[in-house]
A protein has these predicted regions:
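ABC ATPase C-loop
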Residues: 149-150
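Conserved ABC ATPase signature
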Residues: 132-136, 140
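Walker B catalytic motif
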Residues: 161-162
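The feature captures the beta-strand-to-loop junction immediately N-terminal to the Walker
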Residues: 38-40
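ABC ATPase NBD coupling module
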Residues: 57, 69-89, 115, 127-130, ...
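Helix-to-loop junction immediately C-terminal to a conserved catalytic motif
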Residues: 53
Length: 235
């Protein structure tokens, strides 16, 4: 993994109307690294992803993406810099087939995966490629949501609660996909409540509480930081 810094979030504040949600988020992500934002519901993790893409209301602070300040850019410009977002609600087009959903996204960078590469990574989608979005299971919809952003050529992937509510066999498959993406030098920000899913995948974990980073835990520090994990996550 390169030590080159790909994303730096500094003193990030974000608002929904009058509600002050993020209170000075600070973290960095290196190129090819997977980091996880861990915390309870309402901690500000999803808002952080949305703020990176400019999908919240007012933002202050700094978001440096591959050396460029993006805090004042509109969402479409940020996406065009190679950012892919997989929201918790997935956003599958119900009236389109699985394959039509895959063909829909615009290109934001070179190197987007071909349909053959997608189907090799997600064999279930090959089998279901002619099925309408409404006929896909929750796990298949989650695979499709991830596959769709891989088609765009994005190199920074913002993944929001991708394991939530899914069968263990699907969660295991998604973990395998993330490992493959790390091998391909994708940079990943993983928002998760499922510590057991995130911990083996993340190079570093940031515990988020009340819209702030409370602690950073490296992959090799999990054992000695058990008390901290218990305090904030109950694990």
């Amino acid at each position: 993994m390169s030590a080159t810094e790909y994303l730096r979030v500094s003193d990030l504040h974000a608002f929904y109307g009058e509600s002050h949600v993020l209170h000075g988020m600070d973290f960095t992500v290196r190129r090819g690294e997977c980091i996880s934002l861990l915390g309870r519901n309402g901690a500000g993790r999803t808002t952080t992803l949305r703020a990176i893409l400019g999908l919240t209301g007012r933002r202050t602070g700094s978001i440096m993406l591959n050396g460029r300040e993006v805090i004042g850019m509109p969402t479409h410009r940020i996406a065009q810099l190679g950012v892919g977002y997989c929201p918790e609600e997935r956003g599958i087009y119900a009236s389109l087939s699985c394959e039509e959903n895959l063909l829909l996204p615009p290109q934001v960078g070179s190197g987007g995966l071909s349909l053959d590469e997608i189907y090799e990574m997600f064999p279930n989608l090959r089998e279901r490629r002619h099925s309408q979005g409404t006929r896909l299971s929750g796990g298949e919809q989650q695979m499709l949501a991830m596959a769709r952003i891989l088609r765009t050529g994005a190199r920074l992937l913002l993944l929001d609660e991708i394991s939530e509510g899914l069968a263990p066999v699907i969660v295991q498959k998604l973990g395998e996909v993330i490992r493959k993406l790390k091998q391909r030098d994708y940079t990943i920000v993983l928002v998760e409540q499922n510590f057991r899913f995130a911990a083996p995948l993340a190079d570093r974990m940031f515990i988020v509480e009340h819209g702030q980073v409370m602690a950073e835990i490296a992959q090799g520090e999990i054992e000695q930081k058990q008390e901290l994990l218990q305090e904030y996550l109950g694990v």
